[in-house]
From Swiss-Prot:
Family that this chain belongs to: Belongs to the universal ribosomal protein uL15 family.
Gene, per the UniProt record: rplO
Role according to the record: Binds to the 23S rRNA.
Pfam families (UniProt xref): Ribosomal_L27A
GO CC aspect terms: cytosolic large ribosomal subunit
Protein name: Large ribosomal subunit protein uL15
Disordered, as annotated region: 1-61
InterPro entries hit by this protein: Ribosomal_uL15, Ribosomal_uL15/eL18, Ribosomal_uL15/eL18_sf, Ribosomal_uL15_bac-type, Ribosomal_uL15_CS
Domain of life the protein comes from: Bacteria
GO molecular function: rRNA binding; structural constituent of ribosome
PANTHER family: 50S RIBOSOMAL PROTEIN L15 (PTHR12934), LARGE RIBOSOMAL SUBUNIT PROTEIN UL15M (PTHR12934:SF11)
Subunit-level organization: Part of the 50S ribosomal subunit.
GO BP field: translation
Keywords: Ribonucleoprotein, Ribosomal protein, RNA-binding, rRNA-binding
């Protein structure tokens, strides 16, 4: 026995159909393409979205909205995630990234009020919800909003 003499089991491999090789092959003359028409000709095939000259679906649908080039996206941090830091720590976007709480700094950090803050820390953030600001003050912590439009300290 030799690797060069191995053959597949009889009936396990089906031979490919030889198209357009005479009527005795079973796929002669039109080679399974039907009669005349664009799809019976050789060359480039039609794209999937082609609808025979009818106005395509994607062009029939109305355009809507636009992409705002000055859109700001904030990294979201919840209050319960801030319990990871020790008392007296100053928490900023870079320290949140080092701690693995956020992946990217984006346009800044936004603090939301999910959970409860148990530590006394100073938080530097671009934005914070009103409920989050109230919870932070209630816990004895401090939040400093670092955007131009916000007050320098709340």
């Amino acid at each position: 026995m030799d690797l060069s003499t191995l053959k597949p089991v009889a009936g396990s491999r089906k031979s490919s159909t030889r198209k357009a090789r005479g009527f005795s092959a079973g796929k002669g003359k039109t080679a399974g393409r039907g009669q005349k028409g664009q799809k019976a000709r050789e060359g480039k095939k039609l794209r999937l979205s082609f609808e025979g000259g009818q106005m395509p679906l994607m062009r029939r649908m109305p355009k809507r909205g636009f992409n705002n080039i000055s859109r700001k996206e904030y990294a979201i941090v919840n209050l319960d995630q801030l319990n990871k830091f020790d008392d007296g720590t100053t928490v900023s976007a870079s320290s949140l990234k080092e701690a693995g709480i956020i992946k990217k700094e984006l346009s800044g950090v936004k603090v939301l009020a999910s959970g409860k803050l148990n530590k006394k820390i100073t938080i530097h953030a671009a934005k914070a919800s009103q409920a989050a600001q109230d919870s932070i003050k209630e816990a004895g912590s401090k939040i400093i909003l670092t955007t131009e439009t916000a007050d320098s300290e709340n």
